[in-house]
């Protein structure tokens, strides 16, 4: 049996390294102009061709319609021998609810124990003290895995029309059947409704 070896050119690797360094230093991917300047090329098409190959081979993903919507995937990090990065996505409340913030503030390297799920994680900075008995304090960075599967007792990232919050998900066989529980007796439970959506499960505090 022949094992197919993954091939990446020097130029493609250089593009990945530039994107990685820019994520670390600036907190977002480089623009087309910045990439062309770093690579010393003038043609947009040349860069698009490189992106197409990298995307086809699952080294990166691209967000349609976004000039900076480039994400390095697990294979891409491996190709440049770099630690995977996770986005830090603003603030969310460990109190009541705060307005959802989707902007990425920065990118942070992941430890080896979570590298295998690098494509499906995000880091959230929390506000408030409703989770202090779970050792989550104001300003802490929490690593969440993006998922749709939860069990009672999970600490979750929950979204509603009012905003987002971090709480413990509780599901039981008596009323109230499902709710979000703070880990601070000064705060009330939040009853689960059809308008709520849990989008992440806590992996650990960073």
What do these predicted regions represent?
Residues 15, 46-47:
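Helix-turn-helix DNA-binding helix
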Residues 115-206:
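Acidic/glycine-rich C-terminal interaction modules and beta/coil loop segments
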Residues 29-39:
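A short alpha-helical element within helix-turn-helix/winged-helix DNA-binding domains
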Residues 14-21:
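Pre-recognition alpha-helix immediately N-terminal to the DNA-recognition helix
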């Amino acid at each position: 049996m022949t094992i197919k070896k993954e091939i990446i050119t020097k130029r493609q690797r250089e593009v990945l390294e530039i994107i990685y360094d820019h994520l670390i230093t600036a907190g977002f991917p480089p623009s087309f102009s910045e990439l062309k300047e770093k690579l010393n090329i003038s043609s947009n098409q040349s860069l698009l061709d490189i992106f197409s190959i990298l995307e086809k081979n699952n080294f990166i993903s691209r967000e349609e319609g976004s000039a900076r919507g480039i994400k390095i995937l697990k294979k891409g990090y491996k190709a440049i021998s770099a630690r995977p990065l996770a986005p830090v996505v603003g603030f969310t409340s460990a109190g009541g609810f705060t307005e959802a913030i989707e902007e990425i503030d920065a990118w942070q390297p992941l430890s080896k124990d979570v590298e295998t799920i690098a494509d499906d994680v995000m880091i959230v900075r929390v506000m408030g003290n409703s989770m202090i008995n779970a050792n989550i304090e104001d300003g802490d960075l929490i690593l969440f895995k993006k998922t749709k599967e939860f069990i009672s007792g999970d600490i979750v990232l929950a979204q509603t029309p009012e905003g987002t919050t971090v709480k413990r998900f509780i599901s039981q066989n008596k009323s109230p059947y499902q709710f979000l529980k703070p880990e601070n007796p000064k705060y009330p439970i939040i009853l689960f409704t059809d308008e709520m959506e849990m989008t992440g499960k806590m992996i650990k505090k960073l």
